[in-house]
Swiss-Prot record:
This is Glucan endo-1,3-beta-glucosidase 11. Belongs to the glycosyl hydrolase 17 family. The keyword Cell division does not apply. Residues 399-426 form a propeptide. Keywords: Cell membrane, Cell wall, Cell wall biogenesis/degradation, Glycoprotein, Glycosidase, GPI-anchor, Hydrolase, Lipoprotein, Membrane, Plant defense, Secreted, Signal. It is found in: Secreted, Cell wall; Cell membrane. GO terms for cellular component: extracellular region; plasma membrane; side of membrane. It comes from Arabidopsis thaliana. The keyword Protease does not apply. It is a lipid-anchor; GPI-anchor.
């Protein structure tokens, strides 16, 4: 009996110790890995860069086989994508199954693929054909995953622009555009039925760019500020991104889908822009992305006021500066890294030894606004990898619209929201 009692006591002690040691948060940071460049490093060389910023998740805009193979047995979680041009084909479950067998199954289970996005910001494009095909394509891919026995492992979703909101201030008054509800509601029902995440691309940068005199810079950069209070809930917000996220949650609740979980599929800040792209500087990019990553990784602030029990899932845009992306200068300068593996700017914290040692930054150079005297030698020899046919879909679904209409539409909404936010600063 004494031995049994001893074992019981020891077991209770170990359980208690485990509860103390194990982290209580499941929050992690992800990064968007775009490939629109002719000077990008090989996927194998990319792995240490992703790990150096603490990212455990990667979002692709395609299903590039070279990348998926290179990341096998790394444990890094992947979202892969089907471009807008695939929507009409994916309506057919048999064609979707063929795509799954060619682009997903060969890499499992070594590569941790957990989600497939169907198109990007479709409802903001005002394209009736794409809008009509979106849900059937999502259903077709989900049906194919069921047939392949992968539906429990891999979810299906699509990413939306923040412009699908009619109102977003105060956050409690978040509401979807009425003219989108006929298309959006069945998609939300699909999410509820399949337990897949609702993805939003959110860029506070455009709010500041649109009206830098009215929008408090500290509020959008996660810097210390007085913040705002939602008069309906009493919740305090000290950054715009969290206010935007809760506005989306409020819109979902108003539409009858309170239980859906929101993930931020894109957010970021460019380090360079054209003359009219106010705020696109290395210092602001450092503060936005650096503060966001530090905040998420520290676990100190990983939930929004409206959803205190929901850990955030956020994907930073983007991993590299991509020299072949169309659009304004900023579109080619969202990267955390240059193609040679050096930092595009300091993030304000030390990276791991792989990058820190190669760049010569140490911990001392990590706090300079633009890298200071940091050694600019490449982390690894650049072996240009031009985008192949598997990557061309990214041109159609990247954060950079060729026409500029999509982000312009989102920027107008963000501007209205930000002006209201500025007027309510305490």
């Amino acid at each position: 009996m004494e031995l049994t009692s001893f074992h019981r006591s020891s077991l209770l002690f170990l359980i208690s110790l485990t509860l103390i040691i194990l982290p209580t948060t499941t929050t992690s940071i992800g990064v968007n890995y775009g490939q629109i460049g002719d000077n990008l490093p090989s996927p194998t060389d990319v792995i240490p860069l992703i790990k150096s910023i603490g990212a455990t998740k990667v979002k692709l805009y395609d299903a590039n086989p070279q990348i998926l193979k290179a990341f096998s047995n790394t444990g890094i979680e992947f979202i892969i994508g089907l471009g807008n041009e695939y929507l009409s084909k994916m309506k057919d479950p048999s064609k979707a199954l063929t795509w799954i067998k060619q682009n997903v199954t060969p890499f499992l289970p070594a590569t941790n693929i957990t989600c497939i996005t169907i198109g990007n910001e479709i409802l903001a494009l005002n394209d009736s054909s794409l809008t009509t095909n979106l849900l059937p394509a999502m259903q077709g891919v989900h049906s194919a995953l069921i047939t392949a026995g992968l539906s429990d492992q891999i979810s299906v979703t699509t990413a939306h622009s923040l412009s699908i909101l009619k109102s977003s201030f105060p956050p409690s008054a978040g509401e979807f555009q009425p003219d989108l509800l006929d298309s959006l509601t069945p998609i939300l029902e699909f999410h509820r039925k399949t337990d897949s995440p609702f993805l939003i691309n959110a860029y506070p940068f455009f709010a500041y760019k649109g009206n830098p005199k009215e929008v408090p810079l500290d509020f959008v950069l996660f810097q210390p500020n007085q913040g705002i209070v939602d008069p309906a809930t009493g919740f305090h917000y000290d950054n715009m991104l969290f206010a935007q996220i809760d506005a989306v949650y409020s819109a979902l609740a108003a539409a009858g889908f309170k239980s859906l979980r929101v993930e931020i599929s894109e957010t970021g800040w460019p380090s360079k822009g054209d003359d009219d792209e106010v705020g696109a500087t290395p210092e602001n990019a450092k503060r936005y992305n650096g503060n966001l990553i530090k905040m998420m990784m520290s676990g100190k602030k990983t939930k929004t006021p409206l959803k205190p029990n929901n850990d955030l899932s956020i994907y930073v845009f983007a991993l590299f500066n991509e020299n072949l992306k169309p659009g304004p200068t900023s579109e080619r300068n969202y990267g955390l890294f240059k193609p040679d593996g050096t930092q595009a700017y300091s993030l304000g914290f030390a990276l791991n030894d792989v990058v820190r040692g190669a760049s010569g930054g140490g911990t001392g150079g990590g706090n300079s606004s633009s890298g200071g005297g940091r050694d600019k030698s490449p982390v690894f020899p650049v072996s240009p990898v031009a985008p192949d046919s598997a990557s061309t879909g990214y041109l159609a679904i990247s954060a950079s619209p060729v026409t500029g209409k999509r982000k312009g539409k989102g920027a107008i909404l963000s501007l209205v929201v930000s002006m209201l936010l500025a007027r309510h600063l305490l």
